[in-house]
UniProtKB/Swiss-Prot annotation:
One of the primary rRNA binding proteins, it binds directly to 16S rRNA where it helps nucleate assembly of the platform of the 30S subunit by binding and bridging several RNA helices of the 16S rRNA. Forms an intersubunit bridge (bridge B4) with the 23S rRNA of the 50S subunit in the ribosome. Keywords: Ribonucleoprotein, Ribosomal protein, RNA-binding, rRNA-binding. Transmembrane segments: none annotated. This is Small ribosomal subunit protein uS15. InterPro entries: Ribosomal_uS15 (IPR000589), Ribosomal_uS15_bac-type (IPR005290), uS15_NS1_RNA-bd_sf (IPR009068). Belongs to the universal ribosomal protein uS15 family. Part of the 30S ribosomal subunit. Forms a bridge to the 50S subunit in the 70S ribosome, contacting the 23S rRNA. GO terms for cellular component: cytosolic small ribosomal subunit.
Length: 89
């Protein structure tokens, strides 16, 4: 269900602000988005997997908080990230 380490590393390279950046808001949001998409596919196939559904809701809430933080601190970076990830905002 969780994304592979290779895929996570690719995402980190793409959205990193500098070399070795693994914790910036952009990287965290991008990794969470990939996780959310994977979990969403799993939930569609396994509708009664309520534990995974709860994990999905927690990840969505965490991403929402990070997006709000990024929007409040740097609107331009927020808009670029939302556009590149294809989030509806």
């Amino acid at each position: 269900m969780a994304i592979s380490q290779e895929k996570k590393n690719e995402i980190m390279k793409k959205y990193a602000r500098h070399e070795g950046d693994t914790g910036s808001a952009e990287v965290q949001i991008a990794v969470l988005t990939a996780d959310i998409n994977e979990l969403n596919d799993h939930i569609k196939a396994h509708k009664k997997d309520y534990a995974s559904y709860r994990g999905l809701m927690k990840k969505i809430g965490h991403r929402r908080n990070l997006l709000a933080y990024l929007r409040n601190t740097d609107v331009q970076r927020y808009r670029e990230l939302v556009k590149s990830l294809g989030l509806r905002r």
